[in-house]
Amino acid sequence: MQEIQKITEDIYRTTLPYKDIFTTVYALKTPEGAILFDAGSYDEDAALYIKPFLEELGITEQQLKYVFISHNHTDHAGGLNGFLPLYPNVTVLTRSRKLQEQYPEYKSERTEDGQLILGTYQVVTIPGHTKDCAGLLDVRTKTLISGDCLQSYGIRGSGTWAANIIYPAEHVEAVEKVRKLDIERIVTAHDYDPHGYRADGREAVVKNLDACITPLRNMQKLILEFPELDDVALQEKYNYDPELPKVKHQVIGAMRTAMEEKRIALL
């Protein structure tokens, strides 16, 4: 049996393999039923990891009402292929119309910012990594399950996973929205440098949100300091520090475009 981590009395976490890192699913309990947050990456994840995880927590097929997909990327939504046949009565909650179209034979609903699920979990839209990124805020314990929405400096690993934010202007606005919410804990889908997968207490939450802006600010500085360099050359400069996660040149390009179109202020 894989390790299960208890976040609160009603929020539990387990990790699943993905490339040379991992991804995460969360089980969220309420008096009205349960929610699975994300669905893993691969077809076999449901049978190997997710079903045993839910069973260990005593969550039956009848009790599981929803699977909430934080965004339509493989390591979060790819496991639906194996999951939905095992839990055919669950409703998929997503911001992605494309994801809904992939599974027309199953029930799905498109979520909206501020929507309350099972009287307990509030949808918080946090675009940036993707346009459809969203998390769930437990209004009882003030715990935000953010998935990939809040990435701090990024993920260490073989990939270029540093601050993978391709909609920087929208992300800065969303982070400021989150900053104004009453949040005392953030838990994420991956270990994000430098804070890992969780921030406990208001001070740690603020530091986590500050860390989400820092890489974007550093990219801005490079673009302004070296206007003659293209995105690939700036990528090399950003990635010079071996201790930091590595950024994609497309992320720097997205920041450059936002600056040129005056959609983002100096950070």
Feature-to-residue mapping (PLM):
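Histidine-centered active-site/metal-ligand motif
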Residues: H71-H76, H129, C133, H190, ...
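Conserved N-terminal boundary motif of the eukaryotic protein kinase catalytic domain
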Residues: G119-V124
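Alpha-helix N-cap/loop-to-helix initiation residues
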Residues: D20-I21, D43, H73-H76, P194, ...
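Accessory terminal helices/loops
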Residues: E176-R185, Y192-L267
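Active-site HxH/HxHxD metal-binding segment of metal-dependent hydrolases
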Residues: S41-I117
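Conserved beta-strand hairpin/beta-sheet module of binuclear metal-dependent hydrolase folds
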Residues: Q2-L57, G135-G147
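Short gly/ser/thr-rich secondary-structure transition/capping motifs
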Residues: Y18-K19, E105-T111, T125-G128
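Metallo-beta-lactamase
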Residues: S41-D43, T125-P127, K131-N218
